[in-house]
Structure formats: structure tokens, C-alpha cells
Amino acid sequence: MNKYAVIAVYALVGLTSFLVFLLLLFPVSFLESRIENWAVSRNIPMQVNNLEYDFPTGMEFSELNLLNIRRTETLATLRPGRVDLQPLSLFSNRLNLSLQGATFGGSVQADLRAPLFATNAYGVDLIASDLRFVDFPPSSWVRSMVVSGGADLQLNRPEARGTSAPWIGVLQLEDVDALLGNPAVQDIVLDNLNGKIEFLIQNNVLTIEKSNFKGDALQGTITGRITLGPDQDRTMLALDLTLRVDTAKLGSPLSALLPKKAWRIRITGPLSTPRFTAT
């Protein structure tokens, strides 16, 4: 056996030993518990089912449930899921999700960015593929929605001010396409939405300070605040939305009925049943 073969055998044995040691040191049940405890400590009640290692650089789970703050109700179920660890990069990991639920479905790829030893700066690059939302309330003129495109989310908090400082966030929309459907009318297509939303999170209140977005058929802004509660019924909205629509580009028979001037819409009430009022 030549020296290269010997080196290869030693490398294989070493890698196998390391993986066995890793599995013994961090069993799956321990890892599931740590993930759930980490989420709960950040007010993100979450339950992971059937987590498995996918050696050498991944993990898979059959189901992830997002719960309400009292852990009595499942708000969303994601399955199956896969996390690809990137050992050559200390700052990012990839999460691939196939979303399956009664009222939603599709796939999302997320690249997570965070300094190795810091807790005050995070980033997420999102790519959504045919993310579908269906079975909206009958009172809503939009009964279904399909979204594709990308987004970049950045969160950071000034270290000098400690944990009392607000989280500062920026959400960048990148070439987002949306299809709004209603069985009674032709679908409305919104293409190439790009924009930026700047916000703060402090004392369970998310405040949108500045925003702008623009697509082929519309442009607009949104400001206001969202008071975060333990569930959808107690998460309260107080938002102001301004839209300017190029009705000729909507591709819908409703275009002729829509106003040519800017729309100003006030969005209030709980997240579960928001109210839209023209102002």
C-alpha cells in the first residue's frame, strides 16, 4: 500500500471517528431540545420532530411546528426540512424548506449569516419558489396568492447600549413576483417588485420608519407599527399604506374600475382579522 493510500485510510478512519464522537457527544434528542430551548428563550415557541444527522455537513427533520406563545396551538407546520452546514464558512448556514400545510405550500431557501461569537448581528438571504397561500377568508377580495422572488433581511443591535437597545432591521425586496387570485375575476399579476423597508423592534413593538417599493404596475410606501402579541389574535396592526398603480399594466378586467390617483389605506386590528380602510 503506497503512502497516499495510507493517508487516505487514516483520513477516513479519523473522519469516521470524529463523526461517531460528535453523535455520542451531541445525540439527536439533545440537539432537538437545545434547538427548542433556544427558540423559546427568544419567544419563538417551536417543536422539532424526527431530527436526523445527514453526515457530514447536514441535518434533516420531518416536521417543524411553530407554536403560539402558550404552546397550546400550532400556527404553522414546515416539512420536510434540511439544514446544510457550511464548515468552510463560520458566518453562514443554509436552510432548505419545503412548506406543506392546509393553507400554504412551496419552498424556501435561506442563507443565514451571523458572526461566530456575536449575538447582536444577523442576516438572512431568502429565495422563495412558488410560495402559495390559499383559502383566504371569503370576505377578502384576494382568495389566493402565489409569491416568488428574493429578499435580504439584516438585523443588528448597537453593542454599547446593551440589551435595552432596539433591534435595527432592513428588509430588501429583490425581484418579487406575486399573483393575486379570486375565482370570480381574472388574476392580478404584480411583477418585479423591488424595495426597501427600514424598521426598529423594541419592547415588543415593530415600528416601520421608512419604506419604498416599486414594480412594473405599482409603487408605494408603508409606515406604522405592529405590536407583537403571544398569538395572531393579540398581534395588533396600525399601518398606513400608500399605493400608486399603473392600472394598464395589471392585466385584469378590474383595471378600469380602479382609481387613477394614489390609494391611501389604513390597516388596523389584529393580525388574524385585519381591517382595511380607505383614508
Name these PLM-found stretches.
Residues 64, 81, 86-88, 102, ...:
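Solvent-exposed loop/turn tips at the surfaces of repeat/solenoid architectures
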Residues 1-16, 38, 192-198, 202-279:
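Extended terminal
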Residues 92-99, 124, 203-210:
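Short, hydrophobic/aromatic-rich segments at coil-to-beta transitions
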Residues 71-83, 102-111, 136-158, 186-196, ...:
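Amphipathic hydrophobic-ligand
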